[in-house]
Swiss-Prot record:
Signal sequence region: none
Pfam families per the UniProt record, alphabetical: GYF, Plus-3, SWIB, zf-CCCH
Species, as recorded: Arabidopsis thaliana
Region (Disordered): 1-24, 72-107, 256-313, 401-426, 624-731, 777-832, 876-915, 1170-1245
Compositional bias of kind Basic and acidic residues: 689-698
Organism taxonomic ancestry: Eukaryota, Viridiplantae, Streptophyta, Embryophyta, Tracheophyta
Biased composition (Low complexity): 661-675, 813-829, 1188-1206, 1231-1244
Keyword DNA-binding: yes
Family annotation (InterPro entries): GYF, GYF-like_dom_sf, Plus-3_dom, Plus3-like_sf, SWIB_domain, SWIB_MDM2_dom_sf, SWIB_MDM2_domain, Zinc_finger_PHD-type_CS
Entry's transmembrane regions: none
Name listed for the protein in its UniProt record: Zinc finger CCCH domain-containing protein 44
Amino acid sequence: MENQQKQLQQGVPELASLAGREESSVRGIDLMRVDQCEEIGVNQVPALSVPASTVAGAVAVPMSNEQEVKVIDEAAPIKRKRGRPPRAQANTPLHIRPPPPPPKKEDKEEDVCFICFDGGDLVLCDRRNCPKAYHPACIKRDEAFFRTTAKWNCGWHICGTCQKASSYMCYTCTFSVCKRCIKDADYVIVRGNMGLCGTCIKPIMLIENIAQGDNEAVKVDFDDKLSWEYLFKVYWLCLKEELSLTVDELTRANNPWKEVPNTAPKVESQNDHTNNRALDVAVNGTKRRRTSDSPTLPNKLDGKNPSNILKKAPGDTSWATKELLEFVSFMKNGDTSVLSQFDVQGLLLDYIKKKNLRDPLQKSQVLCDQMLVKLFGKQRVGHFEMLKLLESHVLIQEKPKGAKTTNGETTHAVPSQIEEDSVHDPMVRDRRRKMRRKTDGRVQNENLDAYAAIDVHNINLIYLRRKFLESLLDDINKVDEKVVGTILRIKVSGSDQKLDIHRLVQVVGTSKAIASYQLGAKTTDVMLEILNLDKREVISIDQLSDQNITEDECKRLRQSIKCGLNKRLTVVDILKTAATLQAMRINEALEAEILKLNHLRDRAKKLELLKSPEERQRLLQEVPEVHTDPSMDPSHALSEDAGLGTRKQDNHVKAQSKGPQNKGVNLNNVGNNVQKKYDAPILRSRNNVHADKDDCSKVHNNSSNIQETGKDDEESEIWHYRDPTGKTQGPFSMVQLRRWKSSGHFPPYLRIWRAHENQDESVLLTDALAGRFDKATTLPSSSSLPQELKPSPHDSGRTGADVNCLQKNQMPVNTSATSSSSSTVTAHSNDPKEKQVVALVACSGKVEDGNSVRPQPQVSCPASISVVPGHVVTPDVRETPGTDQYNTVRADGNHNTTKTLEDETNGGSVSINGSVHAPNLNQESHFLDFPSPTPKSSPEDLEAQAAETIQSLSSCVLVKGPSGVTWSTTTTSTTDAATTTSSVVVTGGQLPQVIQQNTVVLAAPSVKPIELAADHATATQTSDNTQVAQASGWPAIVADPDECDESVSDLLAEVEAMEQNGLPSSPTSTFHCDDDDDLKGPEKDFFNPVARMSLTPETCRLDVSQTSILDNVSAGKSSMLTEAKDNTPFSHCGTAGPELLLFAPPPPPPTAISHDLTLTTTALRLGSETTVEAGTVERLPKSVLGVSSEPSPRSLSSHDSSSARGSTERSPRVSQPKRSSGHSRDRQWLNNGHNSSFNNSHNNRQWPYSNSHGYDHGSGSYAAHPPKGLKICKFYESGYCKRGASCSFWHP
């Protein structure tokens, strides 16, 4: 007990000291709370400050002091929050209960309109806690608007200046402003965010100072219950009582934003009515005496005091406008003396009351008469609107306060106000111009050492554009001092090239470049040193940017400055640098503004022009312009399309005939053959073949036979074609076909024909589009090959046929023959690709009575030469073994698809082939026995003549003379004394190129073995006027001489070796000069019959020993001529110069004579060897024959060269076939209605072209067939394949 009492006694001094601190702290409280703080006494503090320990022990100790027990009991239920108390409460006792919050008053809705202060049917604002009510007519809304569910907020919550949310509102009207607009608004704050506007505070001050109403210049009657002033007074008194507003609060109300800047806000507490002492309360709450450096603003309410208004002479009218002076003169009987604004308002209200101009339905609205319309310019104005409009007519005259004495101290007016009064008339200030002078008081840079903000505004002041720097180059000496410290904008390289990232860097210096560089129209060597983050770099001026800087770039610069990578910029630095760029920045801004205004002026002028009736009338009378397109003219389209299809025609013979895929494509003309028979009188021909009875060796150069495509063919609709469904479409014009072809609607090998023609006379669409028609140049197919044959009569029993080969140069060919007379056949071959004229080769042939053709041995001639004794000229030279891929048409009309040596009864045959490009050439022609004035020859005569013919064709050689190339045939007959020598002249240094490949197979009678004498070979030179065409093409297509050095003896030795091994024999040997076809160029891919062949000055000839060998071979039985494989090579001879072909006729067998004439059209096989059918050779070595007894399933799809062995000692050399670009292509389009005569399933194509390649499996090199779809590599067995495992061919 004693201890507790001692503790209580010891606590008394502490409480006393605490009370002293509380008393000192009360002095710091705002004077507005002085009355509340005075209620706290010193005697009450000890009871409120009892320690907690004492309180805890008070329950067990009986206390005599009832007051202490009462305090403890009251403090016991106090709940304390857990945790450390806030710092503000650290020094205060924890057990003191905070004062309870003031009870919230329920929102009361007002029952009068907030505008007219009258009752009636009112609507409430939907904003929360807004009690204001309005008449719908006062807010200019219909009652139907408020029946909707839409929410409506009154104008009290919207700033009247910027229409944003308001922050400060007036007590007695809908005036409200936001935080930004309050700086310039006529508004004073009374309590919190509530205050009074300049219009409402004046009548309120009149209401509050009614006792001093005698001092007012104008008296207003607020007691008239029928006036608006009475309603306003009632509303204010009710509001004042509800809010407990005092007169002191009204007098201390001000606008703190209109105080002098950069000074501590001071509140002047001054009550003019109670004469209280004014106190200036600082921020810290201590009293401070006002010094001479503390200016004050003039009181806003000084205008109501008559002492502040300067009285002027009655004649002075500078205080108001003309309209207001007229109104005042009317109200005061001509007195226009100076009045205050409040006096003018009183006069205006009296005038409205006297004239009864208020709207009876809306008391807040005034109906203006003629006098008020002049003053306000409206027929109807509101009350507050009227008072505001009146302010613009009153020029307020205030008495300047140069000095004011307060409590014995001198105070000065605001310096800015003194300066303003010194500039303008100190007696008159027009408030309408106040807003224009607000920029004069703009705050300048006070602290020049402060750090500048890194924003777009500041950086633009020191931003050096590229064009600025270009203008500074005129004065090179001042560049350094003007650019140092400026900011540049450069592009930085980033990972994403799509985004242009720029960086702001600062210039730290300049330097000179080693070499000058071009900068627009100027040349300079100035380089800029920049601080790029943390390193110095030197850049040229052309790397700078002229574009405006962005906020992101300023943000990155600000971040780099904060990281210490760049120097911090101060206000002085920016001002100093901006001064150097000020002139350039101003010039640029002015130019941009002037340009903008010029554009606006032009647009205004244009707008004025468009609004004028003259322009409208002119536009109505203007004739619209229609654009023209020359390409829509049909004649223009024809000429344009014709120019695309035509190309320059060269008179020279091209060295190579290329297919659709150029190199490496085998064109297999396994088409649909149509068998037709033509009688001699009805043979139709677009290329008439005339034979001169008197001079068969002269061929007239008739250029009129060659017809070019004309304009009529382009425009006329005469062309037909067949679609994939088999229907014939047409007629169409060439223009339409060309467009459809370019659009890809047609396949590459579509054939078309004219309306007056049939489908058999069709031509390729590609050739027709190129202007190559079949009028004079196309030999479409053997089935549609009409020829006119005119045989000449024979003077003796021996008949020889001279065939004149007409070349492209149309030069006459001289031939010679020992026979007394010979029949002549002249043919023009039409080539749609090259427009060549097939040369007719003069060879020894026999025609008997025009009905049967004497058998002739088979001779291979150049590709452009066709030899058909007495009947047909075929421009292709090729050996045609009797296989299933060649359809043989015999003269008697029998269709023979397989021809063997036994069927031919050992009859010799002559095959002359030419290179082709056109598809669908495997068509058969049946030639009947033509009428002839000569009697038919007997079989015995044919047998005798065959021997002579074989000898005449045995030495068919190529001779290159000074004037050209000559085919010469020298014959030495053992059975006939007559010797026939015929020459075929081929000029131009190159064999002509032909389009079709027709093979003529003639059965020859059996004769004795032939003895060939090489010495009898003669060379016939052509005339000097022959044209040389592409002479450089011959060496390019010839292999090296050392690669073609196999002789006939080597081949025959190989034949015997292969016979002993039981291998099948071949009638010919393989001509292989290329060991690697991969190195072949386009020149080596010459047309088939003369591929890898060139001319030589020497004559390729056979020895007698070779002839004897052939005699010995022919003594045996006749061998079966089986189905020929892909490649049928021919023998060659090795020479020191360019390589020549050797055509060695075999000895005929002694069997019956064949009277058959077979004409076979074969397809072109690019890259294959020229073949020569040697006739019915008996037991020739199988390696020479180069065919297999087993038919190849792909014999028709490829014709590649097979390998041949020169001797048993020589290593075999295999010619590699040409590569294929892909598998065979099945065409969707039908082949113009031609039916295929082949029954092979793998060759039953819809289109004649095939891309697949086959291989010769009968050459003796390979024993097994390749897998389906694979091809044999020719170089694998010989070990020459360099591709190895990467080779795309089959390695068996």
